[in-house]
Amino acid sequence: MNFEFGAKRRDPYAWLEQSLATIHRADWYRSVQPINGRPGATVVLAGQEVINFASNDYLGLAGDKRLMAAATAAIAEFGTGSTGSRLLSGHRELHRELEKAIASTKQTEDALVFSSGYLANLGAITALVGKRDLILSDQYNHSSLKNGAILSGAAVVEYPHCDVAVLKTQLSQQRQNYRRCLILTDTVFSMDGDLCPLPALFDLADEFSCMLLVDEAHATGVLGKTGAGCVEYFGCTGKQLIQIGTLSKALGSLGGYVAGSSALIDFLRNRAPSWIYTTGLSPADTAAALAAIKIVQQEPQHLAQLWRNIHYLKTLLQQLPNLKLLPSESPILCFQLPNATDALKAGKQLRDAGIFAPAIRPPTVPTSRIRISVMATHKVAHIEKLVAALKDVI
């Protein structure tokens, strides 16, 4: 291909408008709308009060006064920013308190807090594998897992969603050609709501001498008897693996973590670039997350209420035979629509009815859908209003 320069120079930014036009034609265009006030089961969105079924604040803790008080107290004592990398001036004892609390919750030897869950995935994956290694990744994994795999320089092979048989075949054919192998999976898939086949993945990791990294972002605080996550839910606590998660969903704050063996965490402190070369998590976010973990541990009623709401909604949705509901074992419930145009129309109809459950479209997902996120703070009336609105949409 020949590109002409010199006297016939073209605007090097012109392609941006052309690309945006293509996005508009495909009904893939996205924009942001302001939400006012505290987070909760109802919010004011662009001036309209709506019932919020789009939030990942599963336990309703982001608006809890105790988290806000903890954040305020941390600001008063430590200031607004951590002021540097944790290896320089950015480390506070508060960070270690949070890491110990995470390790206690996950029943691991140690944990390491990152500035976001996305950065935790990037840092861990790029530190653990490189050019002589192999990554096997579920095709529906989160963007942070996929991008971490690419950045690592390892050979990356995707396996069909939750297909253990194909994964085993891939390992049989390729594992012997690489130094190290890392299996990557979300535990709760954020755009579907289903769970990974964790026990079977453990079996394959053992059989083929692979490391196993699981992203518990949508499972932490939500699954398992104590809310420790999918690892607890499947009875796999104590098994050797790498657990990654976020502090910004059920825990109502901001940040991410890696939990595992002492050797793993010590290694990441020395080799994870997205931890080493960034400012430490702010005191306010750290304190809020620590307060949230204490609430989850001491007040199981929030988790119990979340699951009562999930079961009630599922029972009501069974009365809608035309609803193409995807399999789910989490607070995330999705129903498919034929195309992006229909999904946008359904999202608008719900919004007009006072329900915020926006359309999810390609390229985020392979097929367009409406995604519903259940919270512990939803009332029975909120759930019933959602189902009544869906009857008019479907």
UniProtKB/Swiss-Prot annotation:
EC number: 2.3.1.47
Modified-residue entries (N6-(pyridoxal phosphate)lysine), positions: K249
GO terms for MF: 8-amino-7-oxononanoate synthase activity; pyridoxal phosphate binding
Record keywords: Biotin biosynthesis, Pyridoxal phosphate, Transferase
Residue numbers binding pyridoxal 5'-phosphate: G117, Y118, S190, D215, E216, A217, H218, T246, L247, S248, K249
SUPFAM superfamilies in the record: PLP-dependent transferases (SSF53383)
Catalytic activity: 6-carboxyhexanoyl-[ACP] + L-alanine + H(+) = (8S)-8-amino-7-oxononanoate + holo-[ACP] + CO2
Annotated residues for binding of substrate: R30, H142, T364
PROSITE patterns associated with the record: AA_TRANSFER_CLASS_2
KW Transferase (keyword) present: yes
CDD domains according to UniProt: KBL_like
Pathway in which the depicted protein is active: Cofactor biosynthesis; biotin biosynthesis
GO biological process: biotin biosynthetic process
UniProt enzyme class: transferase
Cofactors: pyridoxal 5'-phosphate
Coiled-coil portions: none
A Pfam family of this chain: Aminotran_1_2
Tree of life domain: Bacteria
Family that this chain belongs to: Belongs to the class-II pyridoxal-phosphate-dependent aminotransferase family. BioF subfamily.
Function: Catalyzes the decarboxylative condensation of pimeloyl-[acyl-carrier protein] and L-alanine to produce 8-amino-7-oxononanoate (AON), [acyl-carrier protein], and carbon dioxide.
Quaternary organization: Homodimer.
Entry protein name: Putative 8-amino-7-oxononanoate synthase
Gene source species: Nostoc punctiforme (strain ATCC 29133 / PCC 73102)
Lineage, top ranks: Bacteria, Bacillati, Cyanobacteriota, Cyanophyceae, Nostocales
